A protein has these predicted regions:
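Gly/Thr-rich phosphate-binding beta-strand-loop-beta motif of the actin/hexokinase/Hsp70
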Residues: 1-24, 188-224
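Conserved phosphate-binding/catalytic loops in two-lobed NTP-binding clefts
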Residues: 159-179
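Short acidic, glycine/serine/threonine-rich loops at helix termini
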Residues: 10, 148-151, 183-186
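Phosphate/ATP-binding catalytic cores across multiple sugar-kinase/actin-like superfamilies
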Residues: 106-126, 180-207
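Conserved beta-strand elements of beta-rich interaction domains across eukaryotes
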Residues: 13-15, 51, 76, 142-144, ...
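Extended hydrophobic secondary-structure segments that form protein cores and membrane-embedded regions
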Residues: 129-140, 170-175, 212-216
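Phosphate-binding loop and its immediate beta->loop->alpha context
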Residues: 19-156
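Short helix-terminating capping/connector loops at secondary-structure junctions
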Residues: 122-132, 163-168, 205-209
């Protein structure tokens, strides 16, 4: 299973190999100074220079860049995004014709290339391409349907698809709170009876919580 979390400021990627419970988070993101980073996250930033695209921690200080682009995927965030761009972003002269989906796809393409490099080193270039893969993409809990569709479009444009991952069986999108809950539940498998009791208590009421609980259960079935 591969998991990719594109945050507003940072991105992180992980895998859990052949389905064991150990989750391995990528730490060796390239960095401008050492070429190898030691952090779990990489800045969700890109810049388009004469020599080509530069991304993440490879971008030198004081260089104009696209940042916080993720928020532009959601049309309801438009007003907020204008304010953020004025106060924080220095990307006004960066590829003005580039749309947010294209910019994010360019960034994720670099993430994908680095992920494949790690998979090649860990499993070998041939072996991992024979393994069934589920790609999990997390999004904010308040993400609109339009924003979700644009996120998936960027993921596909970046190459997270069958041509690049021959055994890609499905792409699952879930919200960040649900992903955290799922991780906790899977970590507490030995307490299944307690979880079942809690679940039955939650779904007994006709509230939005009930709908989220069913969604969580459906997602767990996808992962089995």
């Amino acid at each position: 299973m591969l998991a990719d979390k594109l945050g507003v400021s940072f991105c992180e990627t992980s895998d859990n190999g052949t389905g064991d419970e150990h989750v391995e988070v990528i730490h060796d993101w390239p960095s401008q100074h050492t070429k190898i980073g030691t952090k779990e996250k990489v800045p969700s930033e890109v810049t388009y220079q004469k020599q080509g695209l530069i991304w993440g921690s490879l971008i030198p200080p004081n260089v104009q860049r696209h940042m916080w682009t993720k928020l532009q995927l959601d049309p309801t965030q438009k007003g907020e995004m204008v304010k953020i761009v004025r106060e924080v972003s220095t990307s006004s002269s960066q590829e003005p014709n580039k749309q947010p989906v294209e910019i994010i796809a360019d960034f994720l393409a670099q993430v994908k290339a680095h992920l494949i490099k790690n998979l090649d080193q860990k499993f070998g270039k041939v072996l991992w391409r024979t393994l069934d893969i589920t790609l999990v993409v997390t999004v904010p809990a308040v993400w609109t349907e339009v924003a979700k569709a644009r996120t998936l479009e960027a993921v596909d444009k970046a190459g997270f698809n069958a041509p690049e991952f021959p055994q890609l069986k499905k792409i699952v999108m879930t919200t960040e709170p649900e992903a955290a809950a799922i991780y906790t539940i899977k970590s507490l498998r030995g307490m299944y009876d307690a979880y079942s009791w809690s679940y039955s208590r939650v779904v007994a009421s006709n509230t939005p919580i009930q709908k989220h609980s069913y969604g969580l259960q459906d997602f767990l079935l996808h992962l089995q």
